[in-house]
């Protein structure tokens, strides 16, 4: 068994992902459960309220397919926000908005080819704020809806917990095996 993981820690939370290459393979079960989303006009929206959709404030392992798919969807939406706002970190090895298209296409391909359903990012998980200051005047900024989040330093915008996107096989293994999971924690109490 080969384990791959990423670890993040800050003053309030810690999280990491574990990707196993063997274990209880749920591919057939997932394909059957998500078969209503197999038609070209049907898409399963992520993140959604099926499964865990808030990560980083509780000590727990999230190993359900829906929870892992939500985690991935939230990570991708953080990158999408960076893309549409034109934020880049050229000085960093971290993922940026420039990576969004490639990673989103990878998720759609794995869901369609391996699990036989269509997936789409849930645009309603993003909200826009209008702010004002004396120098800029009115300006807008985007963030995730409060219902869906990954604690700040465990998110893709901080370059964390993205190893599932190393390859299509890694993404498939992360999603299909019950022994692959997201572990979250909190040291606030």
Language-model features: locations:
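Short acidic, Pro/Gly- and aromatic-enriched capping/linker segments at domain boundaries
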Residues: 1-4
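Long, non-globular targeting/processing and low-complexity regions
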Residues: 6, 13-189
